[in-house]
Amino acid sequence: MSAQVIAIDAMGGDFGPRSIVQASIACLSATPSLHLTLVGQPSLLEELISGQTAVDRARLTITPASEVITMDEKPSQALRGKPDSSMRVALELLRDEKVQACVSAGNTGALMALSRYVLKTLPGIDRPAMVAAIPTQRGYCQLLDLGANVDCSAEHLLQFAVMGSVAAETLGIVRPRVALLNIGTEDIKGNQQVKLAASLLQQARGLNYIGFVEGDGLYRGEADVVVCDGFVGNILLKSSEGLATMIAARIEALFRQNLLSRAVGALALPLMRRLQADLAPARHNGASFLGLQGIVVKSHGSAGVQGFQSAIQRALIEIQEDLPRRLHGRLEDLLL
């Protein structure tokens, strides 16, 4: 297998580079064909690497960057004021084809602005969209947009639908069912942009559009791809993660109430751990920026070691599936 090379914005995220370095080294151990370059402050990164054991330095390099984009920094400031930020340098490595993907846990708005500026979008795409896999009763659903585009036109939603369909195809889904997230399934429901988007999706060649889906239908697995604007998608994603965490905590508390519940809990522990692992936000961490001329994966800023590993794994899959090239080909068929 040929090598996969990924640039890691090692300075992004809420907790600094420690967990990012640990996750990177863990991924190297698990994937012999993987090569990583950590982008950031060399002295700090070397110190963190030296504290780890069994590090294959032939597959782990450091690219220096003197500046860091903070989580509360405005995208315009990040774009114009920090030309040597770790985020920008990582994206420039991707643009210059020195790596095949970029992963960052940094400021979402800054990452989107820099990605569009440095990499540019694919022909036929006005705005990239963030997509992630959401667990459902039937498996997983690709949900987009997750916050990159708060206000969207009907044409943007059409572009998101096409990109989400291609992303689902790379995961082995044949003729993915595409739906628009709405407050009802009837044609009369929804705002004007959603209604206009429905008309466009119905006319799109080669797109398996099945109509509107409500929030509960998403979790029942009624669609493989669910499309919405970034305002709605981000709220849905964060609410889902919070709900999953709350349910797990409530069940754990119930099993600790008395001796009988503790005994029942001990019997149910293997199943509960499996369910908790399936629903854990860390397992599903990593939202792809679809529509760029390159692979960019956004990790949660609050992700720990396991969560950041998941983001790197998502980038690996997209490299192996050659997602930008496949996406470009499908966009030519459906949009151009």
UniProtKB/Swiss-Prot annotation:
Keyword Cytoplasm: yes
UniProt-listed PANTHER family: FATTY ACID/PHOSPHOLIPID SYNTHESIS PROTEIN PLSX (PTHR30100), PHOSPHATE ACYLTRANSFERASE (PTHR30100:SF1)
Pathway stated in the Swiss-Prot or TrEMBL entry: Lipid metabolism; phospholipid metabolism
GO molecular function, one term: phosphate:acyl-[acyl carrier protein] acyltransferase activity
Catalysis: reaction(s): a fatty acyl-[ACP] + phosphate = an acyl phosphate + holo-[ACP]
The protein's name: Phosphate acyltransferase
SUPFAM superfamilies associated with the record: Isocitrate/Isopropylmalate dehydrogenase-like
EC id: 2.3.1.274
Keyword field contains Kinase: no
Listed GO biological process terms: fatty acid biosynthetic process; phospholipid biosynthetic process
Summary of the function given for this chain in its UniProt record: Catalyzes the reversible formation of acyl-phosphate (acyl-PO(4)) from acyl-[acyl-carrier-protein] (acyl-ACP). This enzyme utilizes acyl-ACP as fatty acyl donor, but not acyl-CoA.
Family note: Belongs to the PlsX family.
EC top class, as a word: transferase
Record-annotated membrane-spanning stretches: none
Predominant localisation class: cytoplasm
The protein's assembly and partners: Homodimer. Probably interacts with PlsY.
